[in-house]
Amino acid sequence: MKTPSDITVVGLGYVGLPLALAFADQIPTVGFDNDSLRIEQLLEGVDRNREVASEVITASSLTLTSNENSVTNSDFIIVTVPTPVTEDFRPDLTLLESASAMIGRRLRDRSGDRPAPIVVFESTTYPGCTEDFCGPIIERESGLKSGEGFILAYSPERTNFGDVEHTLGTVVKVVSAQTDEAAGIVGSVYRRIAKAGVHTAPDIKTAEASKVIENVQRDLNIALFNETAMIFDRMGIDSSDVFDAAGTKWNFHQYQPGLVGGHCIPVDPYYLTYAAKQVGYQANVILAGRSVNENMVDRIDLKIQELVRSAGNSPDETDVLILGQTFKSDVADFRNSKAMNLTSAMSESFRSVATFDPFAGADDGNQDPFDCAAKFDVVVLAVGHAQFTKSISKVVDLVVAGGILVDLTGRVDRSRTADSDLLFWKL
């Protein structure tokens, strides 16, 4: 096998676009997405996800297309499509199936004198999916045999949206493939952009499992801190003081309790529990952690109602402002946002619930309260956008005299509210 002379990235979302741009600086690269509008916008230098600057896109040599034929003769194909869950929390492999079928169709038309292409999957999934689900689809559509006519590989994405410190270049890349030779080639390709280095897993299933457990671990740790924060609250203990004290021990790992949303941490555990069930194992601890984090919206809603009543007021006579609607801070991604779920839940009990997020459109439901000097009975800091956390005093000023400030982000120091008459509560 030879080192590939070109790369095609299938799927230009939050993961695929930065990846394709990085490779384009090193080797001829095509970025494919079946969303023609997405391609048109990118050709104009517009990333609707607000992750990549316009000048970076327009200055790149990346070839952008929605034409499937671009995949046909590529030597190295990388798949970065989303892998969500269904409404009943089962793996939703629809996009993975579609991408695999498309690649198979295109490989059927491949020139016979070209070497077997390497097809790398980066999408998070359960152990065995690449070889047992994706591979057979490509075989069926292409008429080629996996491991001969094309080579499967897996290198889990480790993108942390909005994080300028942990990037493609600074995070070790895990790679794997059907053969040792192919794994070596995959590693050499990724070393071009992964300056932190490459870790070669012994097989594809191991690499798949490594990605899933990364997010399962984080989900469980946050669940532990969420549950203990609620316990300590009932005891009248400030959980942040508890965690700070415990953190003085060298082997205590600290996490911030809060809402767990998005398309990775609250999704990936279900891929592992699904796979566990297929081999006859009930993953009770993982599912318990998921239950804790999924129930935080309702628990916080009830807690705020309790705070309002303790102040002598009624929720149905209370006006609320929720700051932040994306699933995490400083990212323009609203998918599976628990802040949005909290908004819906509180709208059932409170007189009015307004929201503001700097990453949302400037419509009637997203008016900047800082510009109109509005005041609210309850202000909930749900997402720690820099616009909010850099001006906590302005957030405090949004609360009416004797009102309530709720911090779900851990960004507000209690001392910042000491000189006011408002009631302050945080996880």
Predicted features by range, described:
Residues 1-427:
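Structural/interface elements that position substrates and couple domains in central-metabolism enzymes
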